[in-house]
From Swiss-Prot:
Exhibits natriuretic and vasodepressant activity. Has cGMP-stimulating activity. May help to regulate body fluid homeostasis in a variety of aquatic environments. Residues 47-64 have a biased composition (Basic and acidic residues). One of its GO terms (cellular component) is extracellular region. Its main location: secreted. SMART domains: NAT_PEP (SM00183). Residues 65-86 have a biased composition (Acidic residues). Belongs to the natriuretic peptide family. One of its GO terms (biological process) is cGMP biosynthetic process. This is C-type natriuretic peptide 3. One of its GO terms (molecular function) is hormone activity. Residues 22-136 form a propeptide. Disulfide bonds join C142-C158.
Length: 158
């Protein structure tokens, strides 16, 4: 390995020139690090003041939101009370509560009768052909009556 110093120098110069890096013209522009305790204490006080201001702002926002929520809850309660009063007035004026209980029991008996009637009508509507498919607990097999023998012989029966 031979050292090619002029080649490396030329590469470095081209690299710096292409990147556009320039040395700082005035080193006094850069601020020196905080060296005194007084400056550090001043910075801490400023930070604490900003934190307190932000906390106060957050507390104010929280209080405003709580007040809004309370107002909304009160409105909802008022609406519920109004609705309950309306329902009570309707129920008291006509005596519907007793009639509803009586109708519910009688409609239940009518519903039972309707269900049985529908079942019998459905059974009467079915054709004899479809009724013959069902024997002692349903279809003979998943293939039907004619294909039951073929399915059982082939091993494909259900």
């Amino acid at each position: 390995m031979s050292l090619n110093l002029p080649g490396y120098a030329l590469f470095f110069i081209l690299l710096v020139a292409s990147s556009g890096a320039k040395p700082a013209p005035d080193l006094q522009i850069l601020e020196p690090p905080l060296s005194s305790l007084e400056e550090q204490e001043e910075m801490q006080e400023e930070v604490q003041e900003k934190v307190q201001e932000q906390q106060e702002e957050v507390q104010e926002k929280v209080q405003e939101q709580q007040e809004e929520v309370q107002e909304q809850q009160e409105e909802v309660q008022e609406q519920q009370e109004e609705q309950q009063e309306e329902v009570q007035e309707r129920g008291r004026g006509t005596g519907d509560v007793l009639l509803r209980a009586q109708l519910d029991s009688s409609t239940w008996a009518l519903q039972k009768d309707d269900v049985l009637m529908r079942l019998f009508k459905d059974l009467l509507r079915t054709s004899k052909r479809s009724r013959s498919r069902y024997k002692k607990g349903g279809l003979r097999s998943c293939f039907g009556v004619r294909l039951a023998r073929i399915g059982s012989f082939s091993g494909l029966g259900c």
